């Protein structure tokens, strides 16, 4: 995620005096850093109507997005309102919104569907995975579910123990042979173009921001198409970005990223190569904050098959 600031002039510098005073008052309760995603927050809906947000300063557009996300205002907007809103924003507003985050939880569990083109071959069936992630230190448990490719596989990564290796088994009859493997070794690359460390919502946001910096540094325009989609029952705002240069300078020639309406992260990623072929498709399904103990990342856990 897959999945990117944008380089362009601001749509407006300052709004008129009286309007600016009212906007600043409306956002006074939202001037602090965003709270963690799993922290209860009673943020008031922003006072400025969605149709007028494009007239605000860049800073206040970002604050409006944050307040609208946390208060539930974004998800209440119609499809047409969402498209018009994001079309009206300063090109730097969305990157700033993501940069301020938070782009994930301190620890959380999610299920995901993932397909990647490996050595030119698109898989017949996507991976369906259950993933548990904790930070500081980064620890990951992943299991490939029965209804997807590579069913039965399990891996554990703990950067506090072996930062360059994972412990896992291939599933099926091979699950009696767990072994340590390199994060970037042949076995890991046979199933994914990514490291296990890339699992999670945070990586996709950082990829998006990194790609955006490339556009700015190269002085290239970043064309954007905006639409609203429902993916696996989740309504998202889908942004399609296409670069005139393509790979290898950029991660993808074209990408479509689906923005979650309640959190500053992406729920879906589609990436296309220079020939227009889809080479990566990821959907984060259920994302749930959870607190884990050490047994979650211990291969001796009785619920695991190591």
Residue ranges and their predicted role:
Residues 121, 150-158, 176-181, 249-251, ...:
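A short, polar/proline- and glycine-enriched secondary-structure boundary/capping micro-motif
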Residues 173-191:
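An internal, short helix-loop-strand segment that often contains or flanks glycine-aspartate motifs
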Residues 31-38, 45, 50, 145-147, ...:
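Gly/Pro-enriched, hydrophobic low-complexity segments
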Residues 12-22:
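Bacterial N-terminal signal peptides
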Residues 29-128, 304-306:
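N-terminal cleavable signal peptides for secretion/export
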Residues 24-28:
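Sec/Tat signal peptide C-region and signal peptidase I cleavage site
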Residues 89-175:
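N-terminal mature ectodomain segment of secretory-pathway/periplasmic proteins
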Residues 2-13:
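Bacterial N-terminal signal peptides that target proteins for export
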């Amino acid at each position: 995620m897959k999945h990117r600031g944008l380089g362009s002039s601001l749509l407006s510098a300052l709004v008129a005096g009286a309007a600016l005073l009212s906007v600043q008052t409306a956002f006074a309760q939202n001037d602090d850093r965003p709270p963690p995603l799993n922290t209860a927050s009673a943020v008031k809906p922003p006072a400025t109507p969605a149709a007028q947000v494009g007239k605000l300063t860049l800073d206040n557009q970002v604050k409006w997005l944050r307040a609208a996300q946390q208060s539930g205002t974004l998800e209440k907007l119609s499809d047409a309102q969402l498209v018009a809103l994001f079309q009206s924003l300063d090109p730097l507003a969305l990157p700033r919104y993501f940069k301020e985050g938070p782009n994930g939880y301190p620890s959380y569990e999610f299920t995901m569907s993932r397909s990647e083109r490996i050595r030119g071959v698109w898989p017949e069936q996507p991976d369906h995975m259950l993933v548990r992630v904790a930070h500081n230190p980064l620890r990951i448990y992943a299991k490939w579910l029965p209804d997807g490719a590579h069913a039965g596989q399990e891996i554990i990564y703990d950067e506090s123990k072996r930062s360059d290796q994972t412990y896992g088994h291939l599933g099926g009859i091979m699950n009696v042979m767990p072994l340590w493997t390199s994060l970037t070794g042949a076995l890991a690359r046979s199933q994914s173009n990514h490291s296990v460390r890339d699992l999670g919502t945070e990586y996709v946001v950082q990829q998006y921001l990194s790609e955006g910096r490339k556009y700015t540094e190269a002085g290239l325009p970043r064309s954007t198409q905006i639409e609203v989609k429902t993916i696996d029952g989740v309504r998202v705002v889908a942004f399609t970005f296409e670069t005139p240069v393509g790979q290898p300078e950029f991660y993808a020639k074209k990408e479509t990223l689906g923005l979650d309406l309640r959190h500053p992260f992406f729920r879906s990623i589609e990436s296309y190569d220079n020939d227009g072929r889809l080479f990566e498709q990821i959907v984060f399904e259920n994302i749930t904050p959870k607190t884990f103990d050490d047994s979650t990342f211990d291969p001796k856990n009785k619920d695991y098959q190591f």
